[in-house]
Amino acid sequence: MELCWLTTIHGS
């Protein structure tokens, strides 16, 4: 999945 960068920008 592309959640790797998603979580990075979200800062979760």
Swiss-Prot record:
Pfam families: ENOD40 (PF08247)
InterPro entries: ENOD40
Biological processes annotated in GO: nodulation
Keywords for the protein's UniProt record, in alphabetical order: Nodulation
Role summary: Modulates the action of auxin, and may function as plant growth regulator that alters phytohormone responses.
UniProt protein name: Early nodulin-40
Organism for this UniProt entry: Glycine max
Primary gene name: ENOD40
